[in-house]
């Protein structure tokens, strides 16, 4: 079993990637900052299904915070990092 880190795990793509990895028998650590750019209740709903899985754990953290990011990586090693965290719908 490989341990995956999935950032942006409460988003649509992140939650579905995490679910697929769990179905394939892997351990998944999810990170998301649960910002209010769009409904945090929707993000928490997606997380609720993942949190029911025994091989899933979640850390609420902002990857823009260097200390929080360092803590995620110092807590345990990962075989694979899937970085999906982003500000959705940003237009400049």
Residue ranges of predicted features:
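N-terminal Rossmann-like NAD(P)+-binding domain of SDR-like oxidoreductases, especially those catalyzing
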Residues: 1-92
């Amino acid at each position: 079993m490989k341990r995956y880190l999935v950032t942006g795990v409460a988003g649509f793509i992140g939650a579905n990637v995490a679910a697929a990895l769990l179905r394939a028998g892997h351990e998944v650590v999810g990170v998301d900052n649960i910002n209010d750019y769009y409904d945090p209740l929707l993000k928490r709903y997606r997380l609720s299904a993942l949190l029911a899985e025994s091989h899933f754990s979640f850390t609420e953290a902002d990857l823009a915070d260097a200390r929080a990011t360092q803590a995620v990586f110092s807590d345990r090693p990962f075989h694979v990092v899937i970085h999906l965290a982003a500000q959705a719908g940003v237009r400049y």
